């Protein structure tokens, strides 16, 4: 095809200007396709809420544009394709056919693909926020063609998929942001450790943090608080001491060591004559977060970890057996007759984290030290001493400190612990 416009004429310069605009427009569409579509809605929401002041402004401008991702993608690709297809038409009027093909391919590859995508991949947020109003206009112009295609993509591929990190991925992401990873992160070792511990805490259970019964310091309810026992309690350095009845695995309560300050060792008062607080019993499979939530209520910072034995009554149906296994029982009330206790085991019981209703029924005792304080005290004179159920086996003791250590992923030492280490 012959050249239609010779050099230096008015039409020649008009065609040159149109060609330049088409190349720039195609490059902008190509760069925005990579820059805007590579940013997920989650990333933009994070920047809009917690980014730098400039990033917050940019993210707020871009979010409404990229909210409908398929419509935006169709608009950018349609505009890019239109510009690239129109470029050879105007070039063909200035140069020969082979020259038009060579020049158009070079311009599109260099100025329409490589350079724009390189720039927008690095500065896509700022560029996208700058041209966001222009992109909205293009969306309305291309709406008759882009909207049906975007709806078809929504139907086939789904709409509004949010790319969230799984727990393991989030933990790895936190580790990479630590300054020890050498990638420019600003999180310290303690920060990354605590965050990782919080993420792993939901996967850990009571049996992972408990102290075995064999390694636990416990006292008999009938023991005398003489000078030897008081010195032993003092040497152990615990703030709470579990109390058992008849056998070590039958933990019925706990004694606060601070309540023993007024006890005269020479009087040899029995343990059962001092204030014994109730101690809850938790299954060994109870998540640590549920235990932590219950500890925060203030009823007790120590619990007995029990294991369910495989003893099922012959008359019990399979459905009832499955229901008993799948449910979690937390026994914090010992003021029940044996018949009530047996009936309680057959009822549908709740996990600790669903206990607010029960707490309200007991007068909202959580964090209220002056109300219903007697409900946490073991009444020995009015009721028989409790015993461990036959289908349960006490395996350990867990405290608030044990849960916090799992959260921090480090041992917590107090003054007494350091004293024993020095020895």
UniProtKB/Swiss-Prot annotation:
UniProt domain CNNM transmembrane: residue ranges: 8-191
GO cellular component: membrane
Transmembrane segments: 12-32, 71-91, 95-115, 137-157
InterPro entries registered for this protein in UniProt: ACDP, CBS_dom, CBS_dom_sf, CNNM, Ion_transp-like_CBS
Sequence ranges on the Cytoplasmic membrane side: 33-70, 116-136
Extracellular-side segments: 1-11, 92-94, 158-423
Residue span(s) of domain CBS: 210-271, 275-332, 356-415
Keyword entries, A-Z: CBS domain, Glycoprotein, Membrane, Repeat, Transmembrane, Transmembrane helix
Membrane disposition: Multi-pass membrane protein
Residues glycosylated per entry: 273, 322
PROSITE patterns, A to Z: CBS (PS51371), CNNM (PS51846)
Entry keyword Membrane: yes
Main location group: membrane
Name of this chain's protein: DUF21 domain-containing protein At2g14520
Gene: CBSDUF3
């Amino acid at each position: 095809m012959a050249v239609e416009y010779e050099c230096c004429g008015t039409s020649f310069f008009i065609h040159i200007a149109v060609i330049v605009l088409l190349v720039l427009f195609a490059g902008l569409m190509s760069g925005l396709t990579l820059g805007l579509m590579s940013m997920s809605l989650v990333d933009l929401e994070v920047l809009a809420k917690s980014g730098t002041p400039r990033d917050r402004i940019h993210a707020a401008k871009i979010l409404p544009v990229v909210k409908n991702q398929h419509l935006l993608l169709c608009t950018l690709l349609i505009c890019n394709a239109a510009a690239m297809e129109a470029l050879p038409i105007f070039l063909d009027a200035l140069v020969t056919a082979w020259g038009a093909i060579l020049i158009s391919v070079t311009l599109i590859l260099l100025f329409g693909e490589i350079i724009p995508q390189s720039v927008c991949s690095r500065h896509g947020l700022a560029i996208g926020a700058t041209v966001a109003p222009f992109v909205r206009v293009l969306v309305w112009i291309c709406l008759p063609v882009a909207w049906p295609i975007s709806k078809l993509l929504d139907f086939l591929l789904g709409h509004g998929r949010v790319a969230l990190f799984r727990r393991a991925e989030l933990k790895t992401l936190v580790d990479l942001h630590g300054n020890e990873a050498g990638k420019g992160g600003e999180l310290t070792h303690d920060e990354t450790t605590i965050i990782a511990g919080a993420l792993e805490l939901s996967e850990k259970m009571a049996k992972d943090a408990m102290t075995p019964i064999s390694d636990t310091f416990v006292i008999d309810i009938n023991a005398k608080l003489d000078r030897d026992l008081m010195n032993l309690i003092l040497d152990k350095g615990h703030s709470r001491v579990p109390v058992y009845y008849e056998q070590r695995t039958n933990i019925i309560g706990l004694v606060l060591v601070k309540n023993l300050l007024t006890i005269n060792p020479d009087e040899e008062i029995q343990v059962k004559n001092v204030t014994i607080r109730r101690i809850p019993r938790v299954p060994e499979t109870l998540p640590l977060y549920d235990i932590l939530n219950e500890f925060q209520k203030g009823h007790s910072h120590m619990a007995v970890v029990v294991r369910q034995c495989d003893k099922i009554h012959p008359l019990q149906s399979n459905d009832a057996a499955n229901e008993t296994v799948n449910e979690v029982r937390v026994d914090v009330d010992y003021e029940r007759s044996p018949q009530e206790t047996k009936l309680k085991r057959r009822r549908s019981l709740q996990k600790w984290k669903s206990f607010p209703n029960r707490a309200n029924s007991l007068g909202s005792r959580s964090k209220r030290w002056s109300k219903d304080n007697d409900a946490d005290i073991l009444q020995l004179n009015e009721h028989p001493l409790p015993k461990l159920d036959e289908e349960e086996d006490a395996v350990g003791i867990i405290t608030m400190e044990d849960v916090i250590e799992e959260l921090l992923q480090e041992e917590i030492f107090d003054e007494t612990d350091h004293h024993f280490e020095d020895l």
